[in-house]
């Protein structure tokens, strides 16, 4: 791949859980005109340390710049670019689907095929929860759209490397 070819990259960024860190990280992207596809921030197994999973479409040159700039942010502890073939990544999708007594069984059948689940049932709708790859979630949405999608929300990817990545055990 040429340095100017744009491709999808997933970064796992360990940061100290301090006020304003998320703003500082997103501000770095914004100031330089880099677009974030998705960003998820969550606690890790180590108290006081959060993991940011950042997905971006960028060239190798831009990714080098992103990594250098992130390393300048003091509460950033470690940055790892996750390789697609050595990573498990999933997103969460919740969909409110029009479903009455007539079509509800078909909606539930479709949900079950995708190993998703119905988390709420109302008179004229159901709320479906699904986790999976972007492809799986898009396929489920394609199946549900003919019934009528009333509301939709989807998280960004959370990801873990299948290869052990040593992590810090203390805060500086």
For the regions a language model picked out, list residue spans one by one:
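Short, charge-patterned binding micro-sites
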Residues: 36-59, 83-89
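Helix-adjacent hinge/juxtasegments
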Residues: 58-98
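Short amphipathic alpha-helices in soluble, non-transmembrane regions
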Residues: 25-27, 65-73, 107-112, 140-145
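Single conserved hydrophobic/aromatic residue that forms the stacking wall/gate
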Residues: 163-172
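Long, charge-patterned amphipathic alpha-helical coiled-coil/hairpin "stalk" segments used as oligomerization
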Residues: 84-128, 134
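Short glycine-/aliphatic-rich beta-strand segments at the starts of folded cytosolic domains
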Residues: 7-15, 50-52, 87-98
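Helix N-cap motif at beta-to-alpha junctions
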Residues: 18, 57-62, 100-101, 132-137
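Conserved short beta-strand edge segments in small beta-sheet-based binding/regulatory domains
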Residues: 74-86, 117-123, 148-161
């Amino acid at each position: 791949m040429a340095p100017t070819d744009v491709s999808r990259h997933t970064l796992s960024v360990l940061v100290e859980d301090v006020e304003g860190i998320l703003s500082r990280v997103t501000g770095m992207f914004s100031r330089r005109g880099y677009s974030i596809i998705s960003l998820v921030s969550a606690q890790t197994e180590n108290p006081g340390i959060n993991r940011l999973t950042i997905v971006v479409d960028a060239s190798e040159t831009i990714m080098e710049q992103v990594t250098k700039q992130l390393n300048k942010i003091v509460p950033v502890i470690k940055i790892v670019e996750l390789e697609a073939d050595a990573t498990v990544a999933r997103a969460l999708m919740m969909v409110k689907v029009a479903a009455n007594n007539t079509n509800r069984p078909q909606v539930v059948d479709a949900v079950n095929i995708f190993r998703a689940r119905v988390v709420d049932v109302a008179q004229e709708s159901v709320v479906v929860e699904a986790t999976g790859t972007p492809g799986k979630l898009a396929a489920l949405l394609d199946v549900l759209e003919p019934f009528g999608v009333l509301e939709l929300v989807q998280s960004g990817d959370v990801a873990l490397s299948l290869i052990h990545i040593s992590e810090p055990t203390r805060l500086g």
